[in-house]
Amino acid sequence: MLIISSTQNNEPLAARERAAGELVFIEKDDDAAIKRLKEEADKQDETCEKRMECYLVLKDPTSLWHLQTFGLTKDIERKVDVFATTKEDLLAKTIFVRLPNLQSPFPSLDRAAISRESETTVHLVIVGYSAQAEALAINAALVAHYPNYCRDTRLRTRITIIDDNVLDGRDGLIQRYIHLFDNSYYCSINLKDENPQCIMHRPMYENQRKDFVDVEWEFINGNIHNDAVRQKLTEWSNDCHQQLTIAFCHPDYSRNCNEAFRLPQPIYRNEIPVLCHTTDNELPDCSADKDSYSSVLPFGEKQCDIDTLRMLKKLAQRVNFVYNYCFSLKPGEPITAPSSIDEDVLDSQWKDVGSLTKQYSNIFNAMTLGAKMHSIGRSPKDWKDYYTLTSDEIDVLTEVEHNRWSVEELILGYRPVTPEEQEIVDKDISQKKILRNTKKAHYDLRSFDDLRADSTGKNVNVYDMALCQAIPLIIKSCISE
């Protein structure tokens, strides 16, 4: 079942799903879509082992944030397996996430693999503030985690947003993801000031705890016609230690097309990917010398495909299976990955997760499996025949996974424990779960080398280690012959 909360630019998506035999509802707004979801849930038999699948395409990013952070009512979650998104969020996942069986026309943010010893970092520059800009930014923050940060915490992914009124967008983003930004480095520059200054925000526990957020942010109040912006774009495009991607996301599609071809020339010469948000996935045929602008890539709603979400959920169910396997081991048994995946129990285990927020945690994990394989030099063409990781690869990816998880949890509304709460848990480990469930304070939101033992006496990093061990198994089980 597909429920869409707005007809705006969603007709191609609805038509494809109807043609595939899916039940499709198009509602007038998010409230009507949620009401439709509840009505359909009421028709379902709660005793059925397999729940009805629903892909819920919302209009407002705040509605999506609310569902991801707080979930749905239990009567809906018991009967319907919901994967909520917006068309902007779906499009961002289509662009940034590498999945089995699904070819992407877009280059990865990390076009060259970033290993532990690499000195390069990913830099995403978003021009224009809109719902699509926000979706690209948040999905990049969920995906772009690399091993070299583990060696040098200065090597963070950077997300820069440039807009004539970026300060309003920044404030809304920070208010929505307050715990992410409380614990991140970000700077703001207003080029409209007479003497622009970089105003720097530092993590709330800087110099008290080790750095654990591997994404930093930059908000520039200006546009691509500012000399300072053009100079920076040129510098970044020539920097061999940056893997730069530029995305135009103004609400005005014609402005995106115009500005995508007005960047400093080194950007085109260096073949820096320039993503241009348009209505019909096409750019105007305005240049006789198309090769000079071959790195300008249009993207639009026609590329939204529910198959992206279907594959993500398929992977996420297997991630959940690995976690369940680890927690099913007897006390004293070493935590390790399973040797196979029992596909007969995937749906029932997914239902037993019992929380939409926890399901998103598995989905966000699944979004980075391809990026992790890329960081150890394995491209999608290798996935089918790659059976196991070396112990060194597992060690590296385990730390990357913790860093990824930390950003995910901050996005989902969790925060690190305060010094007082840390003392409480240090004295009584049973308080860890209570604080997590009642205050959304997570004891494990800390640097990798500061992770502690859980109630079983094992360091919590063993679960990430088992999951990384299982990456080839998870991916191979989703590859079609």
Language-model regions, residue ranges each:
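In a subset of proteins, long, contiguous C-terminal domains/tails are tracked
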Residues: 427, 432-434, 439-481
